[in-house]
Amino acid sequence: MRIKIFMLVTAVVLLCCSGVATAAPKTYCEELKGTDTGQACQIQMSDPAYNINISLPSYYPDQKSLENYIAQTRDKFLSAATSSTPREAPYELNITSATYQSAIPPRGTQAVVLKVYQNAGGTHPTTTYKAFDWDQAYRKPITYDTLWQADTDPLPVVFPIVQGELSKQTGQQVSIAPNAGLDPVNYQNFAVTNDGVIFFFNPGELLPEAAGPTQVLVPRSAIDSMLA
């Protein structure tokens, strides 16, 4: 009898253990059908109609937001590439990424900034930025609104710095309409660093589209009192 009871208990334990050993959840790189090299997530797809090359960091705290953006961008591109008439050259989608960090109190931050190049049958190829920022202390995304302390108005300080730096970059005096330079909509892509905040501007936001994408570091010394 004791032997039978022992065998029954052993069988139950083995059955329970086998149920626990479930497959590990997929990483966001696996969800995107990419290859994780340990340092980067590489996604490559090719067809006579298109080429896709995407390079992302292996890890980012807000993986779901990054995954959703990449999936939507890729799927929209594929829809255009596969529904268009044949071309001499395939459509191109190239996405590269750069990471930024800040360790200055009261909160550490981490950011991923994507540079998205698309040649999808338009008059000209386009290159745009998309930034994702993460608050390490509060474990949540940082938006333009939560970047700043409440009841502050940073753009009257930020805009002249941006305009001056863009003039230096272009080698000529840049004139930006105040309604564009003071519009928070144009400052949604940014990365916080120890030195300040880098703002990334897409073509047509502050400068004409022909100027392409631009970026400006606004020194921390100019805005530190307004940062949240």
From Swiss-Prot:
Residues making up the signal peptide according to the UniProt record: 1-23
GO BP terms, alphabetized: cellular response to starvation
Superkingdom of origin: Bacteria
Keyword Membrane: no
Example of a GO MF term: zymogen binding
GO cellular component, one term: peptidoglycan-based cell wall
Subcellular location: Secreted
Entry keyword set: Secreted, Signal
Family (UniProt): Belongs to the RsiV family.
Descriptive protein name: Immunogenic protein MPT64
Organism: Mycobacterium tuberculosis (strain ATCC 25618 / H37Rv)
